[in-house]
Amino acid sequence: MNTNTSTSAHPSAASGERSSLVRLYLSRGILAVVWAVAFAGARDALDGAAITLLVVYPLIDAVSSLIDYRALPEGSERRVTLFNGVLSTLAAIGVGLAGASGVEAVLHVFGAWAVISGAAQVLVGLRRRGPELGKQWPMLIAGGLSLLVGVFYNVQALGDDPSLSALVTYAAGGGVFFIAQAALLAWRTRQVRTQTA
């Protein structure tokens, strides 16, 4: 499914959109990996540093969604991106409040956010599929995994020994998928430039 008819009709617009997404995805991916490294050292105690990092992660997603939203033309993809930005902002607030209640509450909020934002990411990935922006496999896989991992977090929160350690793998994995998508889009941009030169 490809709803990017406006960009395919105007190659320069499509190239600009690809370049914008390359920068956004690369930045988002690097920030996620850096966050994972930082949280790996702070996750043992749910103290002020850990809660701050937990709030920052969905805020990174919220800012990324806002940047993406502002770069998109009107349409349903833009609405989904705005929804994800608002959702991530609410998740940051929710995680901050849940931090006072303990690991279980944090996992529930993080899990609910991961499920809904993962579904939104899959939807945006499906809408971006096409000749201009590629198949979007890294984004589709990352969104699907986010959805499944979110369910796992909620199940884990109900268990005997809930832990925040899985968030490190989640963030690092998500970051790698964003970096992979940026690399694929950069390759596609180079390929298109070579064909039109």
Residue ranges and their predicted role:
Residues A14, G41, V155-S163, Y170, ...:
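Polytopic alpha-helical membrane-helix bundles and their juxtamembrane interface segments
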Residues G173-T196:
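C-terminal transmembrane-bundle signature of multipass membrane proteins
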Residues A62-G75, Q121-G130, A182-W187:
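C-terminal ends of transmembrane helices
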Residues W35-V37, A91-S101, L145-S163:
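Hydrophobic alpha-helical transmembrane segments in multi-pass integral membrane proteins
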Residues G75-L87, G134-I141:
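Cytoplasmic-side transmembrane-helix entry/capping segments in multi-pass membrane proteins
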Residues A45-I60, G102-I116, V168-G175:
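Structural signature of hydrophobic alpha-helical transmembrane segments
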